[in-house]
A protein has these predicted regions:
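A structural boundary/capping signal
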Residues: 1-179
Length: 179
């Protein structure tokens, strides 16, 4: 993820609405997701393998690519404004795959519930989807789904076989067997 690249950082700043200004907040994430998702053109990778486009290149190409390119872009935009993100790679029951981004929202369930309520009001939806993860220190963390195929941030998750790997901006990765 090239979230420190000026193209990526500048684009992230352009996407945030004035009413969402201030310290990093969930409204900024929603602003970015909405605008990128609205302009996204899905285009497959070349035959014979995956191509992973850096966020700055995807921006320069006019927001075109496949699911992993969207995930890389959204995760990079989140990082560019001070958030924490990860990209999940999942396998489907039919052997296909999918990639999507998640944003860290909190380790405090009350705060998560409040953020989910705000998202539900913004998008007039009944449920907001997030995953949980148990950190090595025993702390439970909450991650909001930012999949391009969802109707809103926190939309339903991709149906996978349970084989999911989370990739972090610092190069770490781990297998995740739960949601």
């Amino acid at each position: 993820m090239d979230y420190r690249n000026p193209t990526t950082r500048d684009y992230a700043l352009k996407l945030v609405n004035k009413k969402s200004a201030g310290n990093y907040n969930i409204d900024q994430i929603c602003d970015m997701w909405e605008k990128v998702n609205d302009k996204w053109t899905y285009v497959n990778d070349p035959q014979g393998g995956d191509y992973f486009s850096p966020a700055s290149r995807t921006i320069n190409l006019g927001l075109k690519g496949d699911c992993d390119d969207f995930a890389i872009l959204i995760a990079s935009l989140v990082e560019a404004i001070g958030g924490a993100s990860r990209i999940k790679s999942a396998q489907s029951p039919d052997g296909g795959g999918h990639a999507y981004a998640e944003v860290y929202i909190s380790d405090d369930k009350k705060k998560v519930d409040s953020l989910c309520k705000d998202i539900a009001q913004r998008y007039h939806c009944h449920s907001v989807h997030y995953s949980t993860d148990l950190e090595p220190n025993g702390k439970k963390t909450y991650w909001l789904n930012l999949d391009w195929s969802a109707k809103h941030p926190g939309g339903p998750y991709y149906k996978d076989t349970g084989s999911v790997v989370a990739y972090y901006p610092d190069g770490r990765w781990k297998k995740i067997t739960h949601r």
